[in-house]
């Protein structure tokens, strides 16, 4: 295929990038690619320890999609082998290790969600156990000899743990080396990653050169802040917008993003043309409420379609802006297995209002749970559904369910 002009590719690829090392090499690789009609091999490694993707993950996925759209080879490497080690990047302590079966299962889930952003027909998926599992101990020694302990301790997270007297296991030193080995195996021309992966990506450049390969270009993308506006987006911090979440939740959570992050979200997680960004920035500063509503709608459309965006927008206006209860409430009827009295934590989970009992407990403690608009304060509350239903159970501002009494009355 005919590749677009280099300047055109660079304009798109620079968008949102925190750092390109080195940028002139990327332009040269693109130029050579165009002259020889040979696509670049662009690598993105994914950590399968947490398979639920959120908008923060899409920052780097969207960059890989841009390379795809230009005609380059996109290789998504699932770290099923390195996942058994656990990525120590940004960690203050050793991560728990997973089994190969767990990393494979998570990796498949990651791929299925990632192809909501990537073109599945143009995405090559590889598992690094293909080559790392076959290494002999002598190969591991040879790989480890490529890096010194002093060099490893230049990593901020390792150095901080070392200075604080926190343990660093030897297997953690092998993680960046194994990740770098992935680049050697597929002969990557470009590797993408978050800014927290800078050390690992640059290490791969050195390892490629030691193996008589052309060094990859490293493109670092920023870590997107979550809905709290301070910490990076993370499901564990309860500030994430999942790409598989219900449209209403996705819309509502986007509307809770601080005003000063509207433009950053537009730039990093939407496909609004680059030339329109200055106008978007001006609009976000002058009318943040309207700009955020447009952003929320666009994000929902990207993952769920226009009709879902219409419903999510209407749901938000009715429940949050007007403070009402939506007309089309989902309903839940307890089953005999729930028992005569149902624990509220279980009821919220079974009605798909929370993902876990711990989340439900936290929401009650925050005063975010009501029954027929009456706030609930007791995390251990049990409900006689046959006597008290029907009622509207609300969790947070956007999650509702109408609880119906069991069909067989009090015989639950």
From Swiss-Prot:
Motif interval(s): 'HIGH' region: 48-57
Primary location class: cytoplasm
Listed GO CC annotations: cytosol
GO biological process: tyrosyl-tRNA aminoacylation
GO molecular function terms listed in the Swiss-Prot or TrEMBL record: ATP binding; RNA binding; tyrosine-tRNA ligase activity
The enzyme's E.C. designation: 6.1.1.1
Subcellular location: Cytoplasm
InterPro entries the record matches: aa-tRNA-synth_Ic, Rossmann-like_a/b/a_fold, S4_RNA-bd_sf, Tyr-tRNA-ligase, Tyr-tRNA-ligase_bac-type, Tyr-tRNA-ligase_bac_2
Chain location of the short sequence motif 'KMSKS' region per the record: 232-236
Binding-site residues for ATP, renumbered to this chain: 235
Keywords: Aminoacyl-tRNA synthetase, ATP-binding, Cytoplasm, Ligase, Nucleotide-binding, Protein biosynthesis, RNA-binding
UniProt catalytic activity: tRNA(Tyr) + L-tyrosine + ATP = L-tyrosyl-tRNA(Tyr) + AMP + diphosphate + H(+)
Pfam entry (one): tRNA-synt_1b
Domain S4 RNA-binding: 342-405
Family to which this protein belongs: Belongs to the class-I aminoacyl-tRNA synthetase family. TyrS type 2 subfamily.
Biological role: Catalyzes the attachment of tyrosine to tRNA(Tyr) in a two-step reaction: tyrosine is first activated by ATP to form Tyr-AMP and then transferred to the acceptor end of tRNA(Tyr).
Subunit-structure text: Homodimer.
Stated name of the protein: Tyrosine--tRNA ligase
Species for this entry: Salinibacter ruber (strain DSM 13855 / M31)
Phylogenetic classification of the source organism: Bacteria, Pseudomonadati, Rhodothermota, Rhodothermia, Rhodothermales
